[in-house]
């Protein structure tokens, strides 16, 4: 008897996790379709490595077409097969041993298919090629991060980012803000999805939308403290230098996923630096630094290797530090170069003006950093970014000296919140209090709707931001004894950054470490 999976009652991620041994990659190029197995992501050379074979008979029931919302099966299937389809307009050739390298910039889109009410196949958004975002669909279940957020554009849900990144214990809970780029209202409602797709217990305290009405000739941005700013005349730096070595400013001129990775060779510096020079207009007392950035997957990997050193004592360590004061946690993170520090130069001295919280590795965020220049007379304007080795990626940098325009901000509380079991969980999300929405399992999810402002916009445009707070805790089952002597060295400032750099050079000098990043051991 055929078994059908109703995704109205069973979250797609839950189904995917249940059948993870059957994850199945199919490559579509100009010439043919091919099964990929033993798939490895090489983030540093920006390519996918795999072996190839003919597509199995259980995966030939339909031929997917990029761009369509859904496709019908030609016949009934049994257990759902989670398929990941890679599309490229360029031919991809395997070598004599059926090994293939696929550059990420050759991938036009990724589409994931799963059973939908037993007879349809659901399309998950195609992803722009040439970016590390391509990896999202592949590594989602291997990373250590936070709740995933998807926004509805009126038709489908798009991945937007992660809630409260880096808040790994209750005392680290904080407000977090980011733009929902794809969110559109339908029937006067905004709808988002928040899901647990990782080995974590996630505690979401509150969700709130900030609907911002601003002038047509401006872009609305938000700083990490939740203040809205407008951007009108951004300018790029005319000079950038990584570890005092000049680089091409064009690298950070556009939102093109051609990023600074903070991995320059250095013999002296404890942390990596990127120095910027901007032309400074006359008599400007304020500037808004505009950054498009994210944390690196390498930082995730480094944390994973660090936590593994605790062995079977990790859960005891996590429990012991659950109530560690926030100030102590923040001090350690700053000493290890985990936040991205923003410094400004004045009279040959650098002064710290902001430390940016983690934003997660899966999606770039647009962040604005307001900087007061009243006591700064330097020309040109010099700014420095500083962090640990390969902890951040910065795609675009600009400065805007314009005054903030007047904006109208509508705070929208949740109107409806229904979890994966059909339960009403609205009360857990409306206020920042001690009532949390707890998502302990992979596949737990909630659909949250907000009533949009009913007033008609006569001029200007809307931008919507998500305000959120909460924390999460890892679920790990490491084995072996803790390496106590080595772990004690991580109390020293800079040790975690040095650990990252050491691992990286070991990683690129041999294949053993690369194999540890194998995404799926896909059954042939």
Language-model segments: residues:
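Residue-level detector of beta-strand face positions
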Residues: 24-26, 341-343, 384
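A generic structural signal for beta-strand entry/edge sites
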Residues: 45-49, 99, 286, 366, ...
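Activation corresponds to long, low-complexity, non-globular regions
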Residues: 135-378, 392-524
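Short beta-strand-plus-loop segments that form exposed binding edges in beta-rich domains
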Residues: 384-392
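Hydrophobic loop/turn residues within beta-sheet-rich immunoglobulin-like superfamily modules
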Residues: 39, 374-376, 388
């Amino acid at each position: 008897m055929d078994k059908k999976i109703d995704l109205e009652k069973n979250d797609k991620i839950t189904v995917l996790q249940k059948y993870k041994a059957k994850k199945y990659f199919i490559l579509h190029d100009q010439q043919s379709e091919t099964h990929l197995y033993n798939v490895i992501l090489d983030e540093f050379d920006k390519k996918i490595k795999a072996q190839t074979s003919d597509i199995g008979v259980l995966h030939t029931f339909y031929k997917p077409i990029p761009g369509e919302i859904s496709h019908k099966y030609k016949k009934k299937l049994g257990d759902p097969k989670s398929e990941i389809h890679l599309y490229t307009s360029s031919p991809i050739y395997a070598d004599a041993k059926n090994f293939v390298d696929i550059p990420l910039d050759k991938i036009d889109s990724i589409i994931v298919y799963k059973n939908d009410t037993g007879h349809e196949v659901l399309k998950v958004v195609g992803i722009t090629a040439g970016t590390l975002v391509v990896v999202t669909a592949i590594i989602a279940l291997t990373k250590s991060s936070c709740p995933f957020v998807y926004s509805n554009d009126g038709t489908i849900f798009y991945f937007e980012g992660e809630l409260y990144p880096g808040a790994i214990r209750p005392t680290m809970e904080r407000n977090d803000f980011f733009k929902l780029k794809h969110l559109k209202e339908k029937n006067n409602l905004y709808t988002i999805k928040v899901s647990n797709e990782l080995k974590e217990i996630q505690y979401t305290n509150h969700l709130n939308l900030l609907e911002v009405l601003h002038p047509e000739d401006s872009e609305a941005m938000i700083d990490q403290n939740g203040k809205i700013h407008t951007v009108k005349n951004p300018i790029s730096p005319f000079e950038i230098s990584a570890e005092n070595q000049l680089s091409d400013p064009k690298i950070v001129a556009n939102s093109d996923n051609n990023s600074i990775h903070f991995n320059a060779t250095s013999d002296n510096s404890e942390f990596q630096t990127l120095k910027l020079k901007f032309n400074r207009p006359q008599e400007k007392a304020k500037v808004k630094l505009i950054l498009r950035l994210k944390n690196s997957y390498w930082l995730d990997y480094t944390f994973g290797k660090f936590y593994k050193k605790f062995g079977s004592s990790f859960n005891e360590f996590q429990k012991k530090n659950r109530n560690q004061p926030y100030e102590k946690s923040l001090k350690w993170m700053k000493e290890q170069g985990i936040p991205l520090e923003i410094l400004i130069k004045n009279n040959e001295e650098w002064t710290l003006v902001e430390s940016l919280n983690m934003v997660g590795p899966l999606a770039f965020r647009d962040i604005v950093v307001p900087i007061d220049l009243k006591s700064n007379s330097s020309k040109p304007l010099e700014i420095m970014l500083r962090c640990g080795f390969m902890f951040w990626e910065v795609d675009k940098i600009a400065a805007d000296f314009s005054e903030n325009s007047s904006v109208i901000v509508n705070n929208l509380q949740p109107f409806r919140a229904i979890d994966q079991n059909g339960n009403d969980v609205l009360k857990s999300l409306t206020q920042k209090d001690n009532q949390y929405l707890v998502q302990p399992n992979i596949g737990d999810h909630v659909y949250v709707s907000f009533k949009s402002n009913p007033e008609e916009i006569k001029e200007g445009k809307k931008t919507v931001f998500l305000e959120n707070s909460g924390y999460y805790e890892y679920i790990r089952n490491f084995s072996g004894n803790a390496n106590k002597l080595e772990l004690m060295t991580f109390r020293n400032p800079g040790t975690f950054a040095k650990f990252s750099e050491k691992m990286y050079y070991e990683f690129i000098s041999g294949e053993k470490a690369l194999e540890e990043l194998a995404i799926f051991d896909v059954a042939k």
